[in-house]
Every structure is written in structure tokens, then in C-alpha cells.
């Protein structure tokens, strides 16, 4: 005979897979053209010079060089640029 009563069911117990978002190459790091710099949802960071934006807002290098993060404009937006070496 069972010494424990049957447990009830639950509607919890699920979680989504982590999306691995965030900065992949930091300021001052050397990158090659095509390297992913930031994976993001929306435009937390905006594309500066020598940086392209994918349709999922991923920022990537369009030229070889060093990564530079800067805040500029009236709205204090964060821009990511590549400074060619």
C-alpha cells in the first residue's frame, strides 16, 4: 500500500531557452568584417560608422578595426562604431 497520497498536477514547470543576448566584442577589441558585436532585442545600441544592423537588430562590423562605444546626440543614444586601423 502507498504511504503517500497522490500529488496533484501543476501547470508550472516550463521555461524558455536563454537567447544569449548582449555585447560580444567590447570597446578596444580588434574585429574582422562580419564579426558580431552586439546581439540585442530592439535598438539598445545603434549602428555607428562601419557597423551594420541585421533584421533582428544584431550589430556587426562591416570593416576591420577596433570597436568603439560612444554616447552622443540629444537623446544620449549609445552608438557602436569601428575605427579602421
Curated annotation (Swiss-Prot):
GO cellular component: cytosolic large ribosomal subunit
One Pfam match: Ribosomal_L27
Ranges for region Disordered: 1-20
InterPro entries: Ribosomal_bL27, Ribosomal_bL27_CS
Gene Ontology process terms (BP): translation
The UniProt record lists the keyword Ribonucleoprotein: yes
NCBIfam families found in the cross-reference section: L27 (TIGR00062)
The protein's name in its UniProt record: Large ribosomal subunit protein bL27
Biological source species: Pasteurella multocida (strain Pm70)
Lineage: Bacteria, Pseudomonadati, Pseudomonadota, Gammaproteobacteria, Pasteurellales
Amino acid at each position: 500500500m502507498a504511504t503517500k497520497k497522490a500529488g496533484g498536477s501543476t501547470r508550472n514547470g516550463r521555461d524558455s531557452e536563454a537567447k544569449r543576448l548582449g555585447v560580444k566584442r567590447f570597446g578596444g577589441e580588434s574585429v574582422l568584417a562580419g564579426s558580431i558585436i552586439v546581439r540585442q532585442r530592439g535598438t539598445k545600441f545603434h549602428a555607428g560608422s562601419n557597423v551594420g544592423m541585421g533584421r533582428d537588430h544584431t550589430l556587426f562590423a562591416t570593416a576591420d578595426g577596433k570597436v568603439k562605444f560612444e554616447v552622443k546626440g540629444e537623446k544620449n543614444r549609445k552608438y557602436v562604431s569601428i575605427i579602421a586601423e
